[in-house]
């Protein structure tokens, strides 16, 4: 066996194997590697986008929370203001009712006082008439007149 012929045969076989591999085996391997490389790049990009979206969502959630707190504080302030207003209205209504009742009581007292005065006037008039009647029936003398007036004073 000739060593040169074997070496040439092996070289031709190796060249054929390299050509066959470059023509039929290498392109699918390169395509698979490119596809995998693209998938990895897409995954990393998606992870970056997801991270960015997560940051935006966290920021938006914080903004929404601040807005909700502000709205809640505003609602509470309005409720407190309305409660104070209701209390003031109730105080005013109570004061008006008290003033009205006081005025009614004063009017009632005034009416009762007027009735009492009128009654006293009638009694004084009756006593005066009775006294005058007694004076006219008796003799008119100073001592009797003074006694009758003292008696009338005592009765008044």
From Swiss-Prot:
Coiled coil: none annotated. F-type ATPases have 2 components, F(1) - the catalytic core - and F(0) - the membrane proton channel. F(1) has five subunits: alpha(3), beta(3), gamma(1), delta(1), epsilon(1). F(0) has three main subunits: a(1), b(2) and c(10-14). The alpha and beta chains form an alternating ring which encloses part of the gamma chain. F(1) is attached to F(0) by a central stalk formed by the gamma and epsilon chains, while a peripheral stalk is formed by the delta and b chains. It comes from the Bacteria. GO terms for cellular component: plasma membrane; proton-transporting ATP synthase complex. The chain crosses the membrane at residues 7-29. The lineage of its organism: Bacteria, Pseudomonadati, Pseudomonadota, Betaproteobacteria, Nitrosomonadales. Belongs to the ATPase B chain family. It is found in: Cell inner membrane. One of its GO terms (molecular function) is proton-transporting ATPase activity, rotational mechanism. InterPro entries: ATP_synth_B-like_membr_sf, ATP_synth_b/b'su_bac/chlpt, ATP_synth_F0_bsu_bac, ATP_synthase_B_chain. It is a single-pass membrane protein. This is ATP synthase subunit b. F(1)F(0) ATP synthase produces ATP from ADP in the presence of a proton or sodium gradient. F-type ATPases consist of two structural domains, F(1) containing the extramembraneous catalytic core and F(0) containing the membrane proton channel, linked together by a central stalk and a peripheral stalk. During catalysis, ATP synthesis in the catalytic domain of F(1) is coupled via a rotary mechanism of the central stalk subunits to proton translocation. Component of the F(0) channel, it forms part of the peripheral stalk, linking F(1) to F(0). Keywords: ATP synthesis, Cell inner membrane, Cell membrane, CF(0), Hydrogen ion transport, Ion transport, Membrane, Transmembrane, Transmembrane helix, Transport. It comes from Thiobacillus denitrificans (strain ATCC 25259 / T1).
